[in-house]
Swiss-Prot record:
Pfam families: Mago-bind. InterPro entries: PYM1, WIBG_mago-bd, WIBG_N_sf. One of its GO terms (cellular component) is cytoplasm. It is found in: Cytoplasm; Nucleus. The keyword Nucleus applies. Interacts (via N-terminus) with mago and tsu/Y14; the interaction is direct. Residues 139-192 form a coiled coil. Keywords: Coiled coil, Cytoplasm, Nucleus. This is Partner of Y14 and mago.
């Protein structure tokens, strides 16, 4: 909480909070306050009745437990700690130590990497498209290929009309595959019929 605000009185006798400077350097305007006003910072926090009741109990004992019983329990506790099972024997409690792993994290990672096998990706051969044709539905594949052919023809028309002067690398690749797509369409038509 902040420090209590100092009020000032003007010539009329009314109270006001003087202008203050913010952390960023700007100034707050002086504020006129009514009689009996308590600033938000100075309003005491709300405490429930239960909290107030617990605050009044200084001993912190559970309900119904008398201080005499507590004193007796503390005496017994103190006596237990001073009594040793065998005179002259010192009892030390050792904490359980965690076993250190013989293999460190770096060595584990090195072992895992040694077990891994690296294989070069194989390039798809010409036989792969024919296998994919047989796997998928031929009518869907035919429809897809016709769509690609329309896109290629649309690109060619754009180039002829002069709308597309320099096609991208992807567009050039697409147009170079026109003959392959036409061949595939013919193969699919023959397989369907």
């Amino acid at each position: 909480m902040s420090t209590p605000t100092a009020y000032e009185h003007d010539a009329d006798g009314s109270k006001f909070i003087p202008a203050t400077q913010r952390p960023d350097g700007t100034w707050r305007k002086p504020r006129r306050i009514k009689e009996g006003y308590v600033p938000q910072e100075e309003v005491p926090l709300y405490e429930s009745k239960g909290k107030q009741f617990r605050a009044r109990q200084n001993d912190g004992l559970p309900v119904g437990l008398t201080p005499e019983i507590v004193a007796q329990a503390q005496k017994k506790k103190g006596q237990r700690s001073t009594i040793q099972p065998i005179p002259g024997m010192i009892i030390t409690v050792e904490k359980k130590k965690k076993k250190k792993k013989t293999v460190t994290g770096v060595e584990e990672a090195a072992e895992k990497l040694a077990k891994c096998e690296i294989q070069e990706p194989t390039l798809p051969s010409q036989s792969v498209p024919t296998e994919s044709i047989s796997q998928s539905d031929p009518t869907k594949r035919l429809k897809n290929l016709r769509k690609k052919l329309r896109e290629i023809e649309f690109l060619e028309e754009k180039i002829k009309a002069g709308l597309l002067k320099s096609p991208d690398k992807d567009q050039k690749e697409k147009m170079s595959k026109k003959n392959e797509i036409l061949n595939e369409i013919d193969i699919l038509k023959n397989s369907i019929l």
